[in-house]
A protein has these predicted regions:
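A beta-strand edge to alpha-helix "cap/lid" segment located at domain peripheries
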Residues: 27-33, 97-166
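Short, low-complexity N-terminal intrinsically disordered segments enriched in polar/charged residues
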Residues: 24-55, 59-63
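Bacterial N-terminal signal peptides
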Residues: 10-22
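Aromatic-acidic/polar surface patches that form glycan- and anion
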Residues: 38, 42, 54, 77, ...
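Bacterial N-terminal signal peptides that target proteins for export
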Residues: 1-13
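A solvent-exposed, acidic/Ser-Thr-rich amphipathic alpha-helical stretch
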Residues: 58-127
Length: 166
């Protein structure tokens, strides 16, 4: 009987250690408040990109990219915020003066964010563009996915590298 009494504290300690390890592992899987805020900020960032493109707001469009960002699509790579802004200003120029200039609406789905660390993340989402003349009809104009590297600069998430894959 004394042997059982001596082993009981060791057994309790072992059980407590296993329980604590399980709790810590479970807690590690739960997102922190900071991570949840970062996910929301990234979601807003990618939506802001589509709003800027659909409304042809060149400054808003450029603002979602880091100063030295790279953006690759259609066989071209644009380097730096000014070159990326020019994508939209060129589009504005092409549409200027058109009586029934085309409109576009981007829809994003299946957004996935993976944090590399607290200042870098990977983002992937699928997109579809509905487009057509202002008077209609609208059709699927394109579809593909975005693959992004995001960086946190001055507390703000920005696109460092974006590749459009169709």
């Amino acid at each position: 009987m004394s042997r059982i009494i001596k082993l009981a504290p060791a057994g309790i300690l072992l059980a407590a250690s296993v329980a604590l390890t399980a709790m810590l592992a479970s807690a590690a899987d739960e997102p922190t408040t900071s991570e949840l805020k970062d996910r929301a900020a990234i979601q807003n960032l990618v939506v802001k990109y589509t709003i800027a493109l659909d409304t042809l707001d060149a400054n808003l469009y450029a603002s979602v990219f880091a100063e030295n960002a790279e953006f690759t699509f259609g066989g071209n790579t644009y380097k730096g915020r000014d070159a990326i802004r020019k994508i939209v200003t060129d589009l504005q120029e092409r549409r200027r003066g058109q009586a029934d200039a085309p409109k576009s609406y981007h829809a994003l789905t299946n957004t996935y964010v993976e944090f590399v660390n607290d200042r870098e993340a990977r983002h992937r989402s699928y997109w579809q563009t509905i487009s057509g003349p202002s008077s209609g009809p609208f059709n699927v104009g394109g579809m593909g996915r975005y693959e992004d590297t995001l960086v946190k600069v001055g507390g703000q998430w920005l696109i460092q590298k974006r590749q459009i894959i169709q």
